[in-house]
Amino acid sequence: SNISVQKIVKNWIEINYRYNSKTWNFETTSKRIISWLSNYKLSYDNASDQYKIDFNNIIQKQALHLLNQINKIKDYHKRLIGISAIILTGLAYNDEKKLIVKGLDHLKKNIRYNLDSFGFPKSRNINSSIIFLKYLILIREWFKESQKEMPDFIDENIFYLGQSYAFFWKNINFDPLFNGNNISNNHEFDLYLKRLGYSFKNENYEFSDYVSLRNKKINLIMDTGPSPSKKFSSKYQAGALSFEFVSNGKKILTNSGYFSKNNIQLNEMSRSSAVHNILVIDDNSSCKFKKNSNSELEIKDGLKITKKKIIN
């Protein structure tokens, strides 16, 4: 009920109005702003005047904190959540229009830095494209609800990311385990898209250096692309020329998937060519990795594709 939720929010504000590193963590703060504003009927409606003043002050204070910290955040996903929270705050408060402008500026930079000219992640990570799509659609819906003018670049990038979503999920209805991708279960997202009237199609058999050859019963999907540059290789798996084969909706040949938790040995193992169904050349992994200053693996020696020919 409103009373219970607002009591929790009020207690949080009283305890955490001043900054502390635990409760004002960048990602946590971003999600808290989105949660409180998205559920305003519970967190805000029918509250006392003093509660509303305190609520508005803490939301705007947290949004400014995110804006001051965002350039320090390297992870694209955390930045995307923070940018979304900043934009939502700007849309929710008429006197905070500067947050919309600054949030959109950071969104453009995040897209420009992480996505190529065709709207696909420079990391070649399929899951990253879905994450970008989800947040851009969320931001688009906020603009519609607020009845404020939406910039064209949001629709443009949703179109390109939708092409990726159709190719890697809608067309095949399973998760291809390439380059950091794991089992994602996008069925709930499909229902969300349908409810909001989004529909994406991609009838091509090649997209962003991945190839999908299929008929009604079988599907062969293959990575035919080069490795990404070092700065985008934190989750890259040395899977060039790796493939998966599906028959009647069931995987017959599959790659290993990506081990994302903090175990260097298992992470390193999941990124070698040896755990892929792959065309092996000279008994070597297609890429070599090294640990950076943060003990994270990144590409040392990558792979370039000089020429390819696909016969469908």
Regions flagged by a language model, labelled:
Residues I81, A238-A240, A274-H276:
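Short, solvent-exposed loop/turn segments at the edges of secondary structure
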Residues W24, T29, S233, Q237, ...:
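Short alpha-helix boundary/capping segments
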Residues S1-I158:
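Aromatic-lined, polymer-binding surfaces characteristic
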Residues Q60-L67, E244, D282, S286:
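A short, hydrophobic secondary-structure junction motif
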Residues S30, K261-N312:
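CBM-like, beta-strand-rich accessory domains located in the C-terminal region of large
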Residues R18, P228-S229, N263-I264:
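Short alpha-helical segments and helix-capping/turn motifs at coil-helix boundaries
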